[in-house]
Structure formats: structure tokens, C-alpha cells
Curated annotation (Swiss-Prot):
Gene3D superfamilies: Glycogen Phosphorylase B. Transmembrane segments: none annotated. It comes from the Bacteria. Condensation of UDP-2,3-diacylglucosamine and 2,3-diacylglucosamine-1-phosphate to form lipid A disaccharide, a precursor of lipid A, a phosphorylated glycolipid that anchors the lipopolysaccharide to the outer membrane of the cell. Belongs to the LpxB family. One of its GO terms (cellular component) is membrane. This is Lipid-A-disaccharide synthase.
Length: 375
């Protein structure tokens, strides 16, 4: 059999992690496989020949995208031309749908097999994107089971491979060891996780600290940990802490240690809610957006829930306090009983963890190779 050539494109750090795991699993089955495309340091370490730095694709927010649109479109056009000339056996677009779905469509029209790894949130909003996916994608690989059901209903070939986080996070976290590592003793501990982006922390940081002050009056001896995504976020939080007397430890990164150590979490909606679920920590989910953005999204979003635990459970498993409902008083009052006993939430968390724990990288590799069995 001729040497297998796999093209991959990842647009951000989370895609680099997924891509490197998939590449490792493919190499275990085809040691001489050749990898081309765009990826980060982890994918390059697995042998990817990256055409340009992945950072050029990692753009957040509408305004930033508009500022770089000409460059992004030029890079995409050149990438499509290069890949059509190279004729890989398969192209795998990892997340970054606004960049990769168009590549998949053009390559499939040129006779190259295409796979999309990580579903965009088409089940929640901009559902018409599924038409583009159906046209441009030979196979969709989803991390979550409800996504796979959506694609089956839409007639898109799909495989639910499980979530890599569910593979790496243990079914039972060692709370005493995590507390010892962070210098925390006995007594109730609450993790505050207001997000990793500047805008999120700007909208939620002070609110979460206000809620923590209220919670201190309701739960005797409670302490708080707040993992900061980077030095900029830490400086932002430190400014908000001026003049407050909170028993709070700021951490640099270490969000997984914070989740392992705590009894409950006050958390921004996002991927971190899945991490909290996998650590079996009861949570209250909060989110605030700019008023106009919230008004628009409220009309676009088709899903009754915003947090991953509720989407996975298909019911309100964890409280969601959004926009004007997210007051410091409401957050503290909702969180206080969960610090004492959150077992009603966490029993279901264990069941969900086991559903998602499927050895995702190997499942994804098997699905890709099954697509190529007749090459």
C-alpha cells in the first residue's frame, strides 16, 4: 500500500491538542504516515509539516476577524491550492469551522475525502450551516452524543468519538492531594472561574467577587480559589480585589487543581463547565454579555440551555443565571446549599463522564481509516 498522506488544519490551542492525539493514534496504525497542513507545537512534535504558524488563524471576536479578513482569505485560498496539488488521502479540519468548512467543500469537490473533527454549535444556532457541512464533509466526528443525534437527523455521516477531557480526567479526583498541593487545609473551598478572556472577566469578575463576599456570610469558614488564565487576567482580578477582605487564593493556570480541590464552583458558561462536571463538582453557571449581543443571541439560539452539563443531561441539572438574573445575591443564595451538599448534581455527572470516556483519539483514528479502507 502506498504511503498514507493525511492533511490536517487546526486553528487554536484546543485543536492542536486534539490533532496531536489523533496523529499519534494514526501513527500507531500507520508508522510511515505523512502529515501536512497547519497546526501548533504539539502537532508539529508529532511530525506535521505546517505550512504557516497556527497563530495566524487564532483570531477571537468579530472585530478582530474583520481586521484580519484579507489575510485569512488569502491564506485559505493558497492552502486549498496547495492541498489540491498535494492530493492527500484525507483532509481533517479540526474545529475552526469558519475557516475549515470552506476548505473541506473545495477539497471534496476535487475528489479528496474530508472529515470535520469537533462539531460547530449548529444544533444551537446558525443551523443552515448543516447544509454546507452535508455538502463538504464525508464524515463528522463529534465529541458529544447529542451532537451526533442532530447530524443523524440531518443525514450527515457522523461518529461520536467521546471527549478527550473525559479520557484524561480521572473518574474520581483526589481532593486531599489537590488541597495539599495548593496549600489548602480542611473546611469548605469554592472555586471562582469567571472565564479566560478579558471581556468575560470584565463582565463577571467583580460580580463573582461580590457573590463570594455574600457567600462568606452564609457559609462559615469558606475559602476561595480563583485560577487566572494568564498574567493579564491576574492583573485584571487583582485590581478588582483592591479594598476587599476575601479569603481568596489566586492561582496561575492550575484550573484542574482548583476543581479537584474545591467543594463547589461558581463558573462562567463555556468549556470549563464540562471540566467541572468531569471533576464531579457541583456548580452554578453564570453569564453576562453586552446587552445588544444578548438580545441578538436570544433570538438566534434554538437551545433551551447554554451550559454543557444541561445540554448533556437534556434537562436543567445545574442552575443557569444569565444576564440580569446573575446578581451577586442570587449567585450566593444558589451556591450556598451546594457547598454543603451537591450530590443531586454530581450523581448524574459520573454517569455522563462514563458516556464521554471512549478513548477519543483512537476512536477518531479508527473512523478516519474506515473512511479510507477502499483507497
Amino acid at each position: 500500500m502506498a504511503q498514507l498522506c493525511v492533511a490536517l488544519v487546526a486553528g487554536e490551542a484546543s485543536g492542536d491538542i486534539l490533532g496531536s492525539g489523533l496523529m499519534r493514534a494514526l501513527k500507531a496504525r500507520h508508522p510511515d504516515v505523512r502529515f501536512i497542513g497547519v497546526g501548533g507545537p504539539l502537532m508539529e512534535a508529532e511530525g506535521l509539516q505546517s505550512y504557516f504558524p497556527m497563530e495566524r488563524l487564532a483570531v477571537m471576536g468579530l472585530v478582530e476577524v474583520l481586521g484580519r479578513l484579507r489575510e485569512l482569505l488569502k491564506r485559505r485560498k493558497l492552502l486549498i491550492q496547495t492541498l489540491i496539488e498535494e492530493k492527500p488521502d484525507v483532509f481533517i479540519g479540526i474545529d475552526a469551522p469558519d475557516f475549515t468548512l470552506n476548505i473541506e467543500l473545495k477539497l471534496r469537490q476535487a475528489g479528496i475525502k474530508t472529515v470535520h473533527y469537533v462539531s460547530p454549535s449548529v444544533w444551537a444556532w446558525r443551523q443552515k450551516r448543516v447544509l454546507k457541512i452535508r455538502e463538504g464533509c464525508d464524515l463528522m466526528l463529534t465529541l458529544l452524543p447529542f451532537e451526533a443525534r442532530f447530524y443523524e437527523e440531518q443525514g450527515v455521516p457522523v461518529r461520536f468519538v467521546g471527549h478527550p477531557l473525559a479520557d484524561t480526567i480521572p473518574l474520581e479526583a483526589d481532593r486531599p492531594a489537590a488541597r495539599a498541593a495548593l496549600g489548602l487545609g480542611e473546611g469548605p473551598v469554592v472555586a471562582l472561574m469567571p472565564g479566560s478572556r478579558g471581556g468575560e472577566v470584565g463582565r463577571l469578575g467583580a460580580l463573582f467577587l461580590d457573590a463570594a463576599e455574600r457567600l462568606s456570610q452564609q457559609v462559615p469558614g469558606v475559602r476561595f480559589v480563583l485560577p487566572c488564565a494568564n498574567a493579564t487576567r491576574r492583573a485584571q482580578i487583582e485590581q478588582m480585589l483592591e479594598g476587599r477582605q476575601l479569603p481568596l487564593t489566586l492561582l496561575d493556570g492550575q484550573s484542574h487543581q482548583a476543581l479537584a480541590a474545591c467543594d463547589a464552583v461558581l463558573i462562567a458558561s463555556g468549556t470549563a463547565t464540562l471540566e467541572a462536571l468531569l471533576y464531579k463538582r457541583p456548580m452554578v453557571v453564570a453569564y453576562r454579555l453586552a446587552p445588544l449581543t444578548f438580545w441578538i443571541l436570544k433570538r438566534l439560539v434554538k437551545s433551551p440551555y447554554v451550559s454543557l452539563p444541561n445540554l448533556l443531561a437534556q434537562r436543567e441539572l445545574v442552575p443557569e443565571l444569565l444576564q440580569d438574573d446573575a446578581t451577586s445575591e442570587a449567585l450566593a443564595n444558589t451556591l450556598a446549599p451546594l457547598v454543603r451538599d451537591g450530590s443531586q448534581q454530581t450523581e448524574r455527572f459520573d454517569e455522563i463522564h462514563r458516556t464521554l470516556r471512549r478513548d477519543a483519539s483512537n476512536q477518531a483514528a479508527e473512523a478516519v481509516l474506515a473512511l479510507l479502507k477502499d483507497r
